[in-house]
Regions:
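Walker A/P-loop phosphate-binding motif and the immediately C-terminal alpha-helix
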Residues: 120-121, 126-164, 286, 292
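Phosphate-binding loop that captures ATP/GTP phosphates
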Residues: 156-158, 162-214, 220, 224-227, ...
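Conserved catalytic-core segment of NTP-binding enzymes
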Residues: 110, 239-376, 390
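Residue-level signature of catalytic and energy-coupling elements of molecular machines
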Residues: 124, 135, 161, 169, ...
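A short, charged, Gly/Pro-tolerant segment at domain boundaries
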Residues: 428-440
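C-terminal boundary of histidine-terminating zinc-finger modules
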Residues: 395-404
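Extreme N-terminal, non-catalytic leader segments
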Residues: 57-132, 426
């Protein structure tokens, strides 16, 4: 795809580039833009996204609404397109009423787009979304450690981070500071092991701390590039795990519409913590899946409890005087060394016991009850395990590095259910599998 050849003539920068006969692919062009000074990069990025969003229909069907359409869109080919009450305030209202989206050129463009996505994902067995209505519940932790666990079992796995403004997959998979290779065929993702690859916008940034301040159309264009221009393993992927931002934003809508255009969504794993504040937002996420017809593979309860060995706990006791608190200002002093020494002498078997505590209050039946309410499987709970957090910080596979840790068993059990729900070897009826998982 020669962006500079097809870019809008209104862009003087693109016009100059065309006159110089620079034939760069979208991937090469975007990678170049990130490396240039901000004013020039902005011009290049504007030019690129003018091209990418020239046709804003994300389906192989001409009936599909544009990605930025209002809820309740009647579709660009409807007789009421641009006139229905749902069209009020939609940025596409005038275009729909003029027939722009239903023109032969638009139909051909959207068909070409769908074909491109289909070709790029033709060797992917399952594309799995990891969703959460609430930020900070450990969605990226679950996504990346599921990827590590599946890869450790020999599956070929890819991780696509579509959290454009807050990417974290690169860090959690140990790929910080890496860059992607851009060629005429597209982007080659970063491989953190022979069968685990990751693609993220963080690989395109000149500085790890650089902010990505983009509006919806630019995010949509970036996601389109990820799906069409990333060259995954030639032998194919068993699982493409797509880590999304919290909520139901442009990234979710665009990703789902792009994938559904080619029948490429296998399902979604929804992550929550036990408290009602999180569940209230996750219920919205589950309703999003219902509206968009995305199968929910199951609900994961993260940070279900805090669980660790007694030997790894710290202990504090009230200070004789506040001035003795060692600078913590809480009126206590550390007594861990004395406690552990006493336990070793008096009752050493206690040190191997697991200490547990509920971190979040659970209400209304908790995540398990919420899953039952929506008729979807409950995949299990992951305890708040310090070693799991350390694995993410270090970019390591948790179940291999800390195989005896408290969350290793639950994480392996979660992946067992995931593989059963989305088998690679043989296709099974999704509804029957969901029913089996709910009964377990």
């Amino acid at each position: 795809m020669d962006v500079l050849t097809h870019a809008p003539a209104s862009s003087s920068l693109c016009a100059a580039a065309r006159s110089a006969k620079l034939g760069l692919s979208v991937a090469q062009y975007h990678t170049l833009a990130f490396q240039l000074p901000t004013p020039i990069a902005s011009l290049i990025s504007d030019c690129l996204y003018q091209y990418i969003n020239t046709t804003n229909i994300m389906s192989s069907s001409s009936e599909a609404p544009p990605s930025n359409a209002n809820e309740g869109c009647v579709g660009p080919q409807s007789e009421d397109a641009g006139k229905a009450s749902a069209c009020a305030g939609c940025p596409n209202q005038s275009a729909c009423s003029s027939g722009k989206f239903s023109s032969p050129e638009a139909v051909a463009a959207q068909q070409a787009e769908a074909d491109q996505i289909r070709a790029a994902l033709s060797n992917v067995s399952h594309a799995l979304l990891v969703l959460s209505g609430k930020g900070g519940v450990g969605k990226s932790t679950v996504a990346c450690q599921m990827a590590w666990t599946l890869a450790s079992r020999g599956y070929s796995v890819g991780v696509l981070d579509v959290d454009i403004c807050g990417p974290s997959a690169a860090r959690m998979l140990g790929a910080t500071g890496q860059t992607v290779h851009a060629s005429g065929t597209g982007w080659t993702p970063v491989y953190v092991s022979p069968n685990l690859a990751v693609m993220s916008v963080s690989f395109l940034l000149p500085d790890a701390d650089a902010a990505v301040v983009w509006r919806g159309p630019r995010k949509n264009g970036m996601i389109k590039q990820f799906l069409t221009e990333t060259v995954w393993d030639d032998d194919g992927l068993d699982y493409l795990i797509i880590d999304t931002p919290p909520g139901t934003s442009d990234e979710h809508i665009s990703t789902v519409q792009y994938l559904q255009a080619v029948g490429g969504v296998s399902g979604a794993v929804v992550v929550t913590t036990p408290e009602e504040v999180s569940q209230a937002d996750v219920r919205k996420e589950l309703n999003f899946c219902v509206k968009t017809k995305v199968r929910v593979v199951g609900v994961v309860e993260n940070m279900a409890t805090f669980r660790t060995k007694v030997s790894s706990l710290g202990f504090r006791k009230p200070a004789a005087a506040r001035s003795d608190s060692g600078g913590d200002g809480d009126g206590t002093v550390d007594c861990t060394e004395d406690v552990i020494k006493t336990l070793k002498e008096k009752c050493p078997e206690i040190l191997d016991l697991m200490a547990t505590a509920d971190v979040f209050p659970s209400s209304g039946g908790g995540p398990r009850g919420m899953a039952q309410q929506f008729g979807v499987p409950y995949l299990g709970g992951l305890p708040l395990d310090p070693n799991l957090l350390k694995s993410c910080e270090d970019g390591k596979c948790f179940v291999e590095t800390y195989s005896d840790s408290s969350a290793a068993g639950p994480l392996n059990a979660l992946c067992d259910k995931l593989v059963k729900a989305l088998p690679v070897e043989e296709e099974m009826d999704a509804e029957a599998i969901n029913q089996q998982l709910m009964e377990e």
